[in-house]
Amino acid sequence: MASSGKCVFLVFLCMVALLAPSEVHAKSMVEVNAAHKWYIVEGLCSKFPDCNKHCKEQKFPGGTCLKLGVNMMCTCIYS
């Protein structure tokens, strides 16, 4: 039988998993052509066939796929 401390921890862990947003947007600064720009990472490019169109629909000036780590990520221009 689990102790009450373990049960409280498991309940807390389940609540965090349920309340966490399904897609977390990360804001990162990337240097492109010696200019610093802020980007919002939307997710894998495979999920967004037209990254630029998706970003414009989200009210950003535009977007592009950038290689972040080993994956190509759809990033929207923040500023």
Curated annotation (Swiss-Prot):
Residues 1-26 form the signal peptide. The keyword Transferase does not apply. Transmembrane segments: none annotated. GO terms for biological process: defense response to fungus; killing of cells of another organism. Its main location: secreted. It is found in: Secreted. SUPFAM superfamilies: Scorpion toxin-like. Keywords: Antimicrobial, Disulfide bond, Fungicide, Plant defense, Secreted, Signal. Disulfide bonds join C45-C65, C51-C74, C55-C76. The keyword Protein biosynthesis does not apply. GO terms for cellular component: extracellular region. InterPro entries: Scorpion_toxin-like_sf. Belongs to the DEFL family. This is Putative defensin-like protein 29.
